[in-house]
């Protein structure tokens, strides 16, 4: 291609751009020649400006349970007609739409009524889209921090019902009428949160009459959001560890008392649980309005572990009892030795021997009455003259003392074995009871809420 045609083509394109820019320049100059951004854009002051409002939710940034603040990223779409900003496209080179700064035109002073950080107004003055009919579309972005009553009773399986109340700050319903663009906020560009999911959303228009001016309506549009928390993070990091601590607590009663490690395991579990609770305490909403489910479960786990320590002390004390310190009541023997083992099929547990020694010591057949000088019973059969000897008498007396001592020791050992057997039976019972309480307690805390959520779908 030769240089001259190329230069001619570039010149024509540049001329078109200049002409287009000149048309917009003339148009803007004409539109704002006598424009007053303070005056409502109506032909008759008795007319009301109709503003269509639409809320587009982009992101759920944060839910602050303690301060009860929900932070969201939104786009607030506002549409109205300004009769002062109309033109004929044929007079301006076919220009039908232009973008102008929002500061130059009249705008509805929409604010977030339930704002929680003191900044009620929308302060991001982006450009508006204006067409030749005077129709204006303004979609400024905003970060809303709205107040929301956070109910943590069912945390972390909770649902929150939060709202955003939008309305004009100075205009009543007789001069500015706001209408919702739709009965639902726009979620087409919503970025999913890792902690919350929006189950339901709706928008309502309200006519409010205040006591100061009962004949004048004030309009607002309120958007409600039902948000459900995703509990997986708390299940993995809080609930399952607490369940494992409870399971370890029950295993304390499976450990033999003779090993001497019962209290060591119990205290170790308690210390581990305490450190664990100190680490995860920041994950739980620190509010006194209600005790959340996860707080109840952590309290249950702590009481569960402490109760196991107290009962373990009682079991160890029972295991080490002796006849010199405790006499076994008959009801204890009947319940823990005779009854419960049969009911619970403790066939593998060796019971203590309760047989009394019926065999008589051979010295009972020997006449030792003359040791004290008193006549004994008449002799039966052969009576050896050796027992008359003093040394023999002394030996017999010593043997009898040893036999009685051995018999006493045997009775003491039998009594001690009975106490150990009672402690062993208690361990077996408590193992079953604690495991059952661990399962029932967990279900009692969470099952009701989980069933309710399942029914809601």
Curated annotation (Swiss-Prot):
Q: Which cysteines are joined by disulfide bonds?
A: 148-162, 212-213
Entry annotated with the keyword Cell membrane: yes
Annotated Gene Ontology cellular components are: acetylcholine-gated channel complex; neuron projection; plasma membrane; postsynaptic membrane; synapse
According to the UniProt topology, which residue ranges lie Cytoplasmic? 317-428
Broad class of where this protein is predominantly found: membrane
What UniProt keywords are attached to this protein's entry?
Answer: Cell membrane, Disulfide bond, Glycoprotein, Ion channel, Ion transport, Ligand-gated ion channel, Membrane, Postsynaptic cell membrane, Receptor, Signal, Synapse, Transmembrane, Transmembrane helix, Transport
Instruction: Output the superkingdom of the source species.
Output: Eukaryota
Q: Which InterPro entries match?
A: Neur_chan_lig-bd (IPR006202), Neur_chan_lig-bd_sf (IPR036734), Neur_channel (IPR006201), Neuro-gated_channel_TM_sf (IPR036719), Neuro_actylchol_rec (IPR038050), Neurotrans-gated_channel_TM (IPR006029), Neurotransmitter_ion_chnl_CS (IPR018000), Nicotinic_acetylcholine_rcpt (IPR002394)
Q: Check the UniProt entry and state the signal peptide residues, or none.
A: 1-20
Q: Which residues are glycosylated?
A: 161
Outline which residue ranges sit on the Extracellular face. Answer: 21-230
Task: Please describe what this protein does.
Answer: Upon acetylcholine binding, the AChR responds by an extensive change in conformation that affects all subunits and leads to opening of an ion-conducting channel across the plasma membrane.
Q: Which PANTHER family match?
A: NEUROTRANSMITTER GATED ION CHANNEL
Please state what the protein is called: Acetylcholine receptor subunit alpha
Give the species this sequence originates from: Bos taurus
